[in-house]
């Protein structure tokens, strides 16, 4: 830690406190001090193993992890620093992003996701706050793999409930089979939010989250989602909703954009498009 000075707290995330700091050469970094659940037990070896995997992720659309500082009681991750995140940008862009910007960000997001999925690394906690942006319009994914390294918390340490808005319906219904499809669902939610300017499914509880999804996409059944009835939190008494037309809740997204989004937001995870397939979609072949 002696290498870094001028610590300025810039945020408090799911896993700890984030500081902006400089090294002795004047370069700026983001230092993430990880809170350890049981300080007397030190850092689990599984966590160290997961973090070491993150150090190997080298891609222009993933925030670089430069260094890991760990002592008996403390773990500090040293990341590259970017000025802004997508959530802050959406907060000031009423009515959503320009279509060319949304497309560029989605392309970069999918590139980063495809790279990680190729290496069997899941994010598990994708949301606009985890997508950092610089002045050149580059998007980089932050906190990759941390959800696996530290476990997905139900609450933030500040007692703020971790957002459910980007969580897939299979996970909400208790599926333990985490695969790349949970990240694709989150990407779809983020895509819709970039287009509309507001979250697509802003639920306040797990039950409310599911109902918001069903109200728009329709209530699943064993015809359109085989084995859905076997999920732990599936309820045969779910209110039955018919799916709405995509155009009714998406402003200004063209036909190919709607087609891509509909393939990301499939209720059945086995029917969702992969990141690699999404990158080949006609939506990215058009000029805006």
From Swiss-Prot:
State what changing residue 32 to R does: Loss of catalytic activity
Cofactor entry: Mg(2+)
Altering residue 158 to D: what's the impact?
Answer: Phosphomimetic mutant. Increases catalytic activity
Q: GO molecular function, one example?
A: RNA polymerase II CTD heptapeptide repeat kinase activity
Gene Ontology terms: biological process: cell division
Where in the cell is the protein located? Cytoplasm
Might you give the EC number(s) for this enzyme? 2.7.11.22, 2.7.11.23
Please describe what this protein does: Serine/threonine-protein kinase. Involved in the control of the cell cycle. Required for entry into S-phase and mitosis. Probable component of the kinase complex that phosphorylates the repetitive C-terminus of RNA polymerase II. In schizonts, phosphorylates ORC1 resulting in its dissociation from DNA, relocalization to the cytoplasm and likely its degradation.
A Pfam family reported for this protein in Swiss-Prot or TrEMBL: Pkinase
The record's subunit annotation is: May form a complex composed of at least the catalytic subunit CRK2 and a cyclin.
Q: What class of enzyme is it?
A: transferase
Which species expresses this protein natively? Plasmodium falciparum (isolate K1 / Thailand)
Q: Which residues carry this modification: Phosphothreonine?
A: 14, 158
Protein name, per record: Cyclin-dependent kinase 2 homolog
In the record, Phosphotyrosine modifications are located at 15
Post-translational events = Autophosphorylates in presence of cyclin cyc-1 but not in presence of cyclin cyc-3.
Active-site residues annotated for this sequence? 125
Q: Which residues bind ATP?
A: 10-18, 32
Q: List the catalysed reactions.
A: L-seryl-[protein] + ATP = O-phospho-L-seryl-[protein] + ADP + H(+); L-threonyl-[protein] + ATP = O-phospho-L-threonyl-[protein] + ADP + H(+); [DNA-directed RNA polymerase] + ATP = phospho-[DNA-directed RNA polymerase] + ADP + H(+)
What family does the Swiss-Prot or TrEMBL record give for this protein?
Belongs to the protein kinase superfamily. CMGC Ser/Thr protein kinase family. CDC2/CDKX subfamily.
Q: How is its activity regulated?
A: Phosphorylation at Thr-14 or Tyr-15 inactivates the enzyme, while phosphorylation at Thr-158 activates it. Activated by cyclin cyc-1 in vitro. Activated by cyclin cyc-3 in vitro.
Gene3D superfamilies for the chain:
Phosphorylase Kinase, domain 1 (3.30.200.20), Transferase(Phosphotransferase) domain 1 (1.10.510.10)
The UniProt record lists the Protein kinase domain at 4-284
GO CC field: cytoplasm; nucleus
Task: Give the keywords, sorted.
Answer: ATP-binding, Cell cycle, Cell division, Cytoplasm, Kinase, Magnesium, Metal-binding, Mitosis, Nucleotide-binding, Phosphoprotein, Serine/threonine-protein kinase, Transferase
């Amino acid at each position: 830690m002696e290498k870094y000075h001028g610590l300025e707290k810039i945020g408090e995330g799911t896993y700890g406190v984030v500081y902006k700091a400089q090294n002795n050469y004047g370069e700026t970094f983001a230092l993430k001090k990880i809170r350890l659940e049981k300080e007397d037990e030190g850092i689990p070896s599984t966590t160290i193993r997961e973090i070491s995997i993150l150090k190997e992720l080298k891609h222009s659309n993933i925030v670089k992890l430069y260094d890991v500082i760990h002592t008996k009681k403390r773990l500090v991750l040293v990341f590259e620093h970017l000025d802004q995140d997508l959530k802050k940008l959406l907060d000031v862009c009423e009515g959503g992003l320009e279509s060319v910007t949304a497309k560029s960000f989605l392309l970069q997001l999918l590139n980063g996701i495809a790279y990680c999925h190729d290496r069997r690394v899941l994010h598990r906690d994708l949301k606009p706050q985890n997508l950092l942006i610089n002045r050149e319009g580059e998007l980089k994914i932050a906190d990759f793999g941390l959800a696996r390294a530290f476990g997905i918390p139900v609450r933030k340490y500040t007692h703020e409930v971790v957002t459910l808005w980007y969580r897939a319906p299979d996970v909400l219904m208790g599926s333990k089979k985490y695969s790349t499809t949970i990240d694709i669902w989150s990407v779809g939610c983020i895509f819709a939010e970039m287009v509309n300017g507001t979250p697509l499914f802003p639920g306040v509880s797990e039950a409310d989250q599911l109902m918001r999804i069903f109200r728009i996409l329709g209530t699943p059944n064993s015809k359109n989602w085989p084995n859905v009835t076997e999920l732990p939190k599936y309820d045969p008494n779910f209110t039955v909703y018919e799916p709405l037309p995509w155009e009714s809740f998406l402003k200004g997204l063209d036909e190919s954009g709607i087609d891509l989004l509909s393939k990301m937001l499939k209720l059945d995870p086995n029917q969702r498009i992969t990141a690699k397939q999404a990158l080949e979609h006609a939506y990215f072949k058009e000029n805006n």
